[in-house]
């Protein structure tokens, strides 16, 4: 399952979620503004900015369609 760590008012987060929905890729969203207990996990993965997208051991940050396509 794909997980998207997002933040409020994050344009790249919105773009990632829209892209995944348009390509019918199911995802679970964790909003780190609303669930701050996940901030440390994102930092431990080596990321400092949202969105962070993960699936199994694959993770990346930002709106990157070429990487999003690998999640299908």
Swiss-Prot record:
GO terms for molecular function: electron transfer activity. Pfam families: Glutaredoxin. Belongs to the glutaredoxin family. Disulfide bonds join 10-13. Electron transport system for the ribonucleotide reductase system NrdEF. GO terms for biological process: cell redox homeostasis. This is Glutaredoxin-like protein NrdH. Residues 1-72 form the Glutaredoxin domain. InterPro entries: GlrX_NrdH, Glutaredoxin, Grx-like_ET, Thioredoxin-like_sf. Keywords: Disulfide bond, Electron transport, Redox-active center, Transport.
């Amino acid at each position: 399952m794909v997980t998207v760590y997002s933040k409020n008012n994050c344009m790249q987060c919105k773009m990632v979620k829209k892209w995944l929905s348009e390509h019918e890729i199911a995802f679970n969203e964790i909003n780190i503004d609303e669930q701050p207990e996940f901030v440390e996990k994102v930092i431990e993965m080596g990321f400092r900015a949202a969105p962070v997208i993960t699936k199994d051991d694959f993770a990346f940050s930002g709106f990157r369609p070429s990487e999003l396509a690998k999640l299908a």
